[in-house]
């Protein structure tokens, strides 16, 4: 795991953009994408760039169960607003949170991941060191699966909803083994609220109680942190 410390999120996002641009130059065809506040400035850099994704595939980490793609709180809507409307891909995949058979949807998503191996996976990290919606205790061997969100994750995401009761209680997420299958992983973390999780990920034991700790065993992980998020490493 290579760590790059930057002054702030803006600088970190520019560094991440240059790395993504380089990987595309070297032939990357499939990007794994994340949502949330962490990658927003990276997506802004991409929108304002010369990059063309019309011959590339994107695969998102996760989606809430019960929200349509047109729901403003869905990750499908987030991606459309923040990236896809400006920079369309040849194909873009997100889990279908309205699938009638959620088990079949997870199997279908695994088939997509097998068909389009991810060259570069963009990640953030949760305060409890979750990646995707893989909460503490998730098996390192997990593939795409249905997740019951923890109270802490629901609370953290409630700021995006009118009231906490509106936050979905389940999501479909790529599993930890799914994430680890990416050829390269670029994880960004900014702000002091992420410092404990970053320290546990980098310096802690490799244990399923710290989902992101599995990244210690990946051959090519780049960690971009600002001074506050990287205070413990």
UniProtKB/Swiss-Prot annotation:
One of its GO terms (molecular function) is identical protein binding. The gene is nagB. The active site is at 62 (proton acceptor), 128 (for ring-opening step), 130 (proton acceptor), 135 (for ring-opening step). Gene3D superfamilies: 3.40.50.1360. Its EC number is 3.5.99.6. PANTHER family: GLUCOSAMINE-6-PHOSPHATE ISOMERASE. Catalyzes the reversible isomerization-deamination of glucosamine 6-phosphate (GlcN6P) to form fructose 6-phosphate (Fru6P) and ammonium ion. This is Glucosamine-6-phosphate deaminase. InterPro entries: Glc/Gal-6P_isomerase, Glucosamine6P_isomerase, NagB/RpiA_transferase-like. One of its GO terms (biological process) is N-acetylglucosamine catabolic process. The lineage of its organism: Bacteria, Bacillati, Bacillota, Bacilli, Lactobacillales. The keyword Ribonucleoprotein does not apply. Keywords: Carbohydrate metabolism, Hydrolase. It catalyses: alpha-D-glucosamine 6-phosphate + H2O = beta-D-fructose 6-phosphate + NH4(+).
